[in-house]
Amino acid sequence: MKVRTSVRKLCRNCKIVKRNRVIRVLCSVDAKHKQRQG
């Protein structure tokens, strides 16, 4: 998982999820697209 100051969708399968005031990007196709804002 990448920790970045700004997260964005990297492909059309990526989803933006808010959990406990943390913005995350999850991808069902490519696990390398996982990101967390921090």
From Swiss-Prot:
PROSITE patterns, per the entry: RIBOSOMAL_L36
Keywords assigned: Ribonucleoprotein, Ribosomal protein
GO biological process, one term: translation
UniProt-recorded Gene Ontology molecular function terms: structural constituent of ribosome
Stretches assigned to coiled coil: none
GO cellular component, one term: cytoplasm
InterPro entries: Ribosomal_bL36, Ribosomal_bL36_sp
Domain of life according to the entry: Bacteria
NCBIfam families given in the database record: rpmJ_bact
Protein family membership: Belongs to the bacterial ribosomal protein bL36 family.
UniProt protein name: Large ribosomal subunit protein bL36
Species annotation: Wigglesworthia glossinidia brevipalpis
